[in-house]
A protein has these predicted regions:
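Post-signal-peptide, soluble extracytosolic/periplasmic N-terminal scaffold domains
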Residues: 32-33, 47, 51-55, 67-207, ...
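Bacterial N-terminal signal peptides
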Residues: 6-14
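Early extracytoplasmic/domain-onset interaction patches
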Residues: 24-60
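Short, low-complexity cationic-aromatic patches
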Residues: 185-208, 287-315, 398-424, 453, ...
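Low-complexity, repeat-rich tail regions
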Residues: 233, 243-263, 291, 326, ...
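Extended intrinsically disordered, low-complexity coil regions enriched in Ser, Thr, Gly, Ala
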Residues: 203-233, 307-337, 419-420, 424-445
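Boundary at the C-terminal end of the N-terminal hydrophobic targeting segment
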Residues: 17-21
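Conserved Ser/Thr-centered positions that define the repeating blades of beta-propeller domains
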Residues: 197, 213-214, 300, 317, ...
Length: 684
């Protein structure tokens, strides 16, 4: 269990506190610079431990003093506070301390050289690629495997169809509110624009370019060839106060209506096949996959069992029509772990325990996005639908607000609000609110059965009199570690609040979330390009992380753990990036022109060098002798190569070949829909 209880210090030495340059690149390693008349060459840090925002690492160094022809080779052990920016995939090293320094071939000068290292710290490289560190951690296992929490894995209602269909999700039984000045009643607990006209006893569903109609929510639905004349006006008035037009962000919305409309008042997933299932074999396995769908559907030829991957969880059935049951990833047929990474379905390896892809995903899920928040800003205003109403959090002495537009928790006789991964505190539920550097430890005991569970993944990492250092891991956005893999959503359905407003909670099912590697990171995304035609009729409000939601015309919905919610705050109050004020510029030609100088800091305190003909170790006389490396050294070399590859992928437009470059939207977590027109209105 992580507990965010911290002691503030009066001053934190941060190289990047006044940074202005947000384009500092991560240059190739090693780096070199001059300081105090000495020439330093620093090799890529090797991670020993990374927990919360504290990094412990080793770096091989070369120090050439004035008048010395031969450099001194050593190992520097460092600790630093990390400022992570997942959008730029960079890590700034701040408050760096030299824990120790050894120079095996120069023991008589070791103390002196260590002192030179400490004095040169202000000139050291202060930025490193996140992908380099993650690749190193994948080898060293320098972070934990996550909380491995127990989530709910019961299958949703899985609907398989072979014709163009759309799924309308309603948050429980439909709740109706009269549209002011009309005879229409709106179903407010769905993101779809769904109206009921009692005089004609007809339902009307907005399809952007058409209206569909039915006498019952269960259908059958058909095109309204002559919709009521006032429908267009009602729609325009309702959408006028919306945070976004639920259709505007999809430029390639289907030109024809779906054949079938399905309505579900419980969690559901829609699997659309273009006709009867068609299969292709996966090389080196006894598996086949369904090719005429954008879903991940497999069949094990030996057992004739079907498998489908939904929100990172596996379900199995003897028939595509079910019934489906959850199967732990560790109990999948062994052939799943043998799927070639470069096959069309290679990305599912991230959801198979024990694979390298799953380990990388788990590691990435532990790295926090960090921000420096000014205490005097930002401002928080919590909106309640009526008087504040609180309910108990199961298994704890705490309570949470059920009718607020923000996660508000009553703990230790005070009110704690978490919005956009910043914690606030107040003595009253309505405020006034102020940024806090203390979070009650019991908040980190909130169970997954609670709709405010996600706040457990927002932490305070430190503070000064003027700033608080916050961070959150992808759990805040709905990505959790369970049974050795990363899954999306807790699996629980949380009843929403229905008053003048509808306040809903995050959903796990209904959006076809797929976990795949893209542009240097693992990304959740809905798999269908047309969320209306092929998939679920819903705006982004049902997802996690909703504040200031927006879409851009033509974007495909890529949902990823690199979304930086701190960007929702004014830049003068929250700084989510930390960069050195004076980035280091090499004073000599880049060291990468010397490929033989590939140095590694061994855990045994020795310096190793990799050359084209193998590994060498420097003895106490300064002579390099060829050695047989231990497996860890070779793994370090491979991870360094992988880190460079991933770093280059991200630099090349943040794109993996064959996958379209897209823009990630802001992902909502608590859909809000007013039944009457308070401002700003959403669903009226």
């Amino acid at each position: 269990m992580k507990v965010a209880s911290f002691i503030c210090v009066a001053f934190v030495c941060s190289w990047a506190a006044l940074a202005q340059d947000t384009t500092v690149p991560d240059e190739r390693w090693p780096r070199q610079f001059d300081s105090g008349g000495n020439h330093f060459i620093i090799y890529q840090p090797q991670v020993d431990r990374w927990k919360n925002d504290r990094l412990e690492a080793r770096s091989a160094v070369m120090v050439t003093q004035p008048g010395q022809a031969t450099p001194a080779y050593g190992i520097v052990s460092l600790s630093a506070r990390t400022a992570v920016d997942k959008e730029s995939r960079t890590v700034a090293l701040e408050d760096v301390n030299v824990v120790g320094a050894t120079f095996p071939a120069a023991p008589s000068r070791q103390a002196y050289l260590a002192d030179l290292i400490r004095k040169s710290l202000p000139d050291w490289p202060q930025m490193i690629s996140l992908d380099r560190l993650l690749a190193d951690i994948a080898i060293t296992r320098a972070v934990s495997n996550g909380d491995n929490i127990q989530l709910k894995n019961e299958p949703p209602r899985i609907i398989v169809v072979t014709e163009p269909s759309v799924l309308i999700l309603i948050d429980g039984e439909p709740v109706f509110r009269t549209v002011e000045g009309t005879s229409y009643r709106r179903v407010i607990n769905t993101p779809a624009l769904l109206l009921f006209e009692p005089l004609s006893n007809r339902f009307y569903l907005d399809g952007d370019r058409w209206w569909m109609t039915a006498a019952s929510l269960n259908g059958p639905w058909s095109i309204a060839t002559a919709p009521p004349a006032d429908l267009a006006r009602v729609k325009a008035e309702l959408l006028e106060g919306e945070q976004q037009d639920p259709h505007a962000h999809i430029a390639d919305l289907a030109q024809a209506p779906p054949t079938k409309v399905l309505v579900s008042t419980s969690p559901a997933e829609l699997l659309v096949l273009q006709g009867q299932a068609q299969y292709l074999p996966i090389p080196t396995t006894e598996l086949v996959y369904v090719t005429n769908t954008d879903r991940d559907i497999f069949m094990d030829v030996r057992s004739q069992m079907f498998y489908v991957l939904l929100s990172g969880r596996w379900f199995q059935a003897k028939s595509l029509q079910g019934p489906w049951s959850f199967v732990p990833g560790a109990k999948l047929p062994r052939d799943f772990s043998m799927i070639p990474p470069d096959s069309p379905k290679g990305y599912v390896l991230a959801s198979i325990p024990g694979t390298e892809q799953a380990r990388e995903a788990v590691i990435a899920n532990q790295i926090p996005q960090t921000a420096e928040v000014r205490r005097s800003e930002p401002r928080l205003n919590v909106r309640y639908d009526g008087d504040p109403e609180f309910r108990p959090i199961e298994g704890t002495p705490m309570q949470y607000a059920v009718n607020a537009d923000t996660d508000v928790i009553l703990a230790e006789s005070r009110y704690w609000a978490c919005r956009n991964a910043i914690w606030f505190v107040s003595d009253a539920p309505q405020g006034p609110w102020e940024v806090t550097d203390y979070i009650p430890a019991e908040i980190y005991t909130i169970p997954p059965t609670s709709p405010v569970y996600r706040v457990r993944y927002v932490y305070v990492y430190g503070c000064t009199p003027d700033f608080v250092y916050f961070g959150y891991t992808p759990g805040y956005l709905g990505a959790f570690v369970s049974d050795g893999v990363v899954v999306f959503g807790t699996g629980w359905w949380y009843p929403g609040w229905y008053g003048d407003w509808w306040y809903g909670w995050p959903w796990t099912w209904g959006f076809g979330f797929r976990f795949s590697y893209w542009g240097g990171g693992w990304f959740w995304r809905p798999i269908a390009p047309y969320w209306w035609y092929h998939h679920t009729h819903a705006t982004a409000r049902f997802y996690y992380d909703h504040w200031n939601t927006h879409w851009r015309p033509g974007d495909r919905e890529w949902i990823h753990n690199n979304v930086n919610v701190y960007n929702r705050w004014p830049q003068n109050s929250v700084r989510s990036r930390s960069y050195p004020t004076n980035p280091v510029s090499p004073v000599r030609p880049p060291v990468q022109a010397q490929p033989r100088r590939d140095l590694y800091a061994g855990r045994d305190g020795q310096i190793y060098q990799h050359r084209t003909d193998g590994w060498y170790q420097q003895n106490r006389s300064g002579v390099w002798n060829k050695v047989t490396p231990n497996p860890q050294l070779e793994q370090q070399r491979q991870s360094r190569s992988l880190g460079q590859e991933r770093h280059d992928e991200f630099k090349n437009r943040g794109q993996v070949p064959g996958i379209p470059h897209t823009v990630a939207p802001r992902l909502p977590s608590r859909p809000v829909a007013p039944a009457h027109p308070p401002v700003p209105a959403r669903h009226r």
